[in-house]
Amino acid sequence: MERAIFAGGCFWCMVQPFEEQAGILSVRSGYTGGHLPNPSYEQVCAKTTGHTEAVEIIFDPKQIAYKDLVELYWAQTDPTDAFGQFEDRGDNYRPVIYYTTERQKEIAEQSKASLQASGRFDQPIVTTIEPAEPFYLAEDYHQGFYKKNPKRYAQSSAIRHQFLEENWS
C-alpha cells in the first residue's frame, strides 16, 4: 500500500472523488504542513498554525497509479489560485501536492509541467509540490462529511462544482 496527501481547499470536497475510485482503501481528512502538533479545526481556521486542510489517501498501486491520483487531484482544484480554493480563502486552503517519495515528487512535477504546457489555463499553475509532513487527522465530524451532511456539502461545494464543470469537463 502507498500513501498520497493532497490539499485542495476545504477537505470536505476532496474526499468523495477519491473514495469513488477502485484501489482506494481509505481517504481521511486532516491537517498537514504546519508547526503545531495535533492542531484542532479551530486552530487551523484561525490561520496561526501554518497547516493546510488536506486528505490522506491510502491506495493499492496495483489497482490505481499515483499518476492517476494526481490527474484526479488537478480536476478537483483551481491550480491557478495560490491563495485558497473557491470560496475558501487563506493559506490553510492553498493547493499543495505533498509527496511521500522521490518518485511521487517526479510524477507530480511532470504532471504539473504537462498541465502548464497544455494551455488549459491562461494563468500559471501555482499549486506547490512539497515534501509530506506529519498528517494529523481532523475531528470525527469532518470524516466522510459529504455522506453525513449531504445538503450542507452540496451548498459548500457549489462554487467548486461550477468551476470544475466549466474548466475540467
Swiss-Prot record:
Gene3D superfamilies: Peptide methionine sulphoxide reductase MsrA
Keywords attached to this entry: Oxidoreductase
Catalysed reactions listed for this entry: L-methionyl-[protein] + [thioredoxin]-disulfide + H2O = L-methionyl-(S)-S-oxide-[protein] + [thioredoxin]-dithiol; [thioredoxin]-disulfide + L-methionine + H2O = L-methionine (S)-S-oxide + [thioredoxin]-dithiol
Its EC number(s): 1.8.4.11
GO BP terms in the entry: protein modification process
HAMAP family assigned to the protein according to its UniProt record, in alphabetical order: MsrA (MF_01401)
Alphabetized NCBIfam families for the sequence: msrA
Protein name listed in UniProt: Peptide methionine sulfoxide reductase MsrA
The organism's taxonomic lineage, starting at the top: Bacteria, Bacillati, Bacillota, Bacilli, Lactobacillales
Protein encoded by which gene: msrA
